[in-house]
Amino acid sequence: MTELPPDERRTALIVAVRAEALVDDFRRRHRDFAFERGVPPHVTVLCPFAPAASVGDGMRAELAAHFSGLAPFAAELTEVAQFDVAVWLAPRPRDRFVDLIAATCARFPDYPPYGGEFPEPEPHLTVAELSDRSEKIGDSVERVVERARVVLGPGLPFAFRVDAVTLLEEQGDGNWRESCRFGLGL
């Protein structure tokens, strides 16, 4: 694999959800791209964020100030849902996640969510993304949704606390690692 040059490495802001015991086997089985790249279970706040090379002390201070002004909250993953080719768990209360995402997008308007492809993103925790490989082995999104309901459903609702936002940074090998965490309400 070719090493990614530093000026091409990306960052992302996420709410990491300590749900590995619930979702990692499912993510592994369905070859979730983020799972394969070292990204923990999460709800995306803003991706892509700033290029990694531009995230220095000043940007980190801005992020810390922004997130410290937002209140932490209790949350749950409550149900299995789907987009076109993605299967995900719905985080609730939805409005708190929408507000967190909207406030962050408003504070950093140069970095629209999903590069502008989805200007009003639906909060979600992806557990499977179907691809050409999925079609070759006979999986349809409906079958994966049903499998998710059977496998993951008994673990729902899954309670967690949203008290920080994590900055992930893409590495030269294409994998992602936690760069730092910003506490909410500090």
Q: Predicted regions span which residues?
A:
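Basic, often amphipathic N-terminal segments
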Residues: 1-74, 94-161, 169, 173-186
